[in-house]
Amino acid sequence: MKKIILAAFMAACGLQMSAQQNLFVAQDLESAIVNKDNTVTFNFKAPDAKKVQIAGDFAERAEGQHIGGMVGAGLIDMTKNAEGIWTYTTKPLDSELYSYEFMVDGVPTIDPNNVYVYRDFATTSNVFIVGNGKADLYKVNKVPHGTLAHRWYHSDGMKMDRRINIYTPAGYEQSGNRKYPVLYLLHGMGGDEDEWTTFGRAAQILDNLIAQGKAEPMIVVMPNGHAAMEAAPGESSLGYYKPYHMKNGTMDGAFETYFPEIVKFVESNYRVQADKAHRAIAGLSMGGFHSANISLNYPD
């Protein structure tokens, strides 16, 4: 038995050492480098590739061109140097959050030299932020920070527990009996409860606007608008699976019908001003459709 335990221990140590070694591999190549003049430089090492292109929402798209899962992305040819590194530098870009991916001999590929990757339902892309403008609101700045909680509520109507993200402003925990207005913020067809806080940078924007006095401290509730889903892919009891659009029940009205369950959960667990004057709802695309229907059916 001692020999078995020792062998298992040594095997575990070997795995750990292998994993640790990866931390010290030289990472000389950088990509999505935002330069001082707001140009951005991309680098990708693929000496055997015949053609490498970059697909990004900063590139002009040719008529009829569709790049993987990236809506509005155009294709730009990259240039290979003698070391097999493909490179491209953009023109100066406006201040914004941008997404992109590489096309290596026609195959969509994530940039391995940029660890910042977002998932938009079933597709992934690298992202970067060009500052010196409105995108400074998307950054983590030295301001008081709110709290983003991943909560679960039970839906009797949908017969499941469902995940929901709730932002509370800086100082909420120390504010005694103070009550806050609440915004219900709904995502689009390709999103889930995580969309507004990843791609949307909602928590950072709220922190910055509240700190600047441009927004009132508020609670923001971000549920999952796909009625058939417990939670975002990888966060539910289904485990890791390949996401796909338009699950059964997505647009059958169930989310709108049982929306009062979300309001009840929020008002039972958070100090909100629970009246029509201090309650708002907004959404993007499908979320706008949901917002309109919920407002018509529940005008309070």
Segments predicted by a language model, with ranges:
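N-terminal edge beta-strand
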Residues: 20-41
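Bacterial Sec-dependent N-terminal signal peptides
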Residues: 1-21
